C-alpha cells in the first residue's frame, strides 16, 4: 500500500539571543495558526495525529516544531555548544517561540504546549499576552519542583532507557498499546536534552507569585490535564487556573501526561472544547 500524506516538513533559520538555530517544523491545515510545543526531551511527532485530524485542519493551520537540540532541530549553529551545560531558561524559551512565530508570519496564533510546553504557555500569557490569540497549557502548573536531577545524565545509567521508562506509568493504562509504545519510543531518542529541559521545568519556571498578573480576558488561558497524570496532578492545574483572571480548567478523564501522543482520540474531544471556548471569547 502507498499513501502520501499532506503534512509537510520544512526548515527555517532564526536568530534568538545571539544563537542561530535551524528549526524544523511540520505543518498542515488552513485557518487560525495553532502552534504546538512537544514535551521535554521529545520532538514534534507527539502531535502526529493532530496534524492529520480532518476536523481540526479544516479550521486551523497546525504547526508542530522541534525545539533546538530536539528531533531535527540542531543546537545553535554559531556556538561551541558542547563546551557548556545546556540549561533552558524561561526567558530564552519564550524568546525562541516569539521569534519562530514572527519568522513564520503567524498572525495572532494560538499556542499549545504539553508538560514543560504547557508551563511555557503560562509564561507566554504573562510575558507576551498581545502576541497570542490564546494559550492552551496542557499538563501544566505554576510550579513543578524536584525533577532537575543528576541521574538523568549519569554515566552509571542508560539515559535513553531511564528517560523512556519514566513515561510508562504517566500514561493511562487503557490508552492504545500502539500509541503508548510510540510515546516510549520517542523518549529513547532525546535523553541528552532532557535534563536541560527540566532546568526550565523545575528550576526557572515559578509563577506562584505571578499568576495574578496573567489576564485571561486579554489572552485566554484554557488549561487541560489528564486524570492519570501524577507529575502534574489535576488539582495542581485547577489551582493554577483558579488564580488566573478568566482562567479555565478542563479535566481530561481516561488519559495521562502525554495526551496528544498516548491517545489522540480521547484528547481531541477536550481540545475541541478548549478551541470552542477560545473562539467564543475572541470573536466578540
Where are these regions (language model features)?
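Active-site loop/oxyanion-hole signature of alpha/beta-hydrolase fold enzymes
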Residues: 18, 64-112, 269
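Short beta-strand/loop motif that positions the catalytic acidic residue
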Residues: 217, 223-225
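Flexible "cap/lid" loop of the alpha/beta hydrolase fold
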Residues: 119-163
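Conserved alpha/beta-hydrolase catalytic His-Asp/Glu region
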Residues: 146-147, 151-152, 159-216
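Catalytic active-site module of serine/aspartate enzymes centered on a nucleophile-bearing elbow/loop
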Residues: 247-284
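Conserved HGGG/HGGXW glycine-rich cap/lid loop of the alpha/beta-hydrolase fold
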Residues: 21-79
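Acidic catalytic loop of the alpha/beta-hydrolase fold
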Residues: 227-232
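Alpha/beta-hydrolase fold catalytic core
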Residues: 1-35, 57-60, 106-107, 272-284
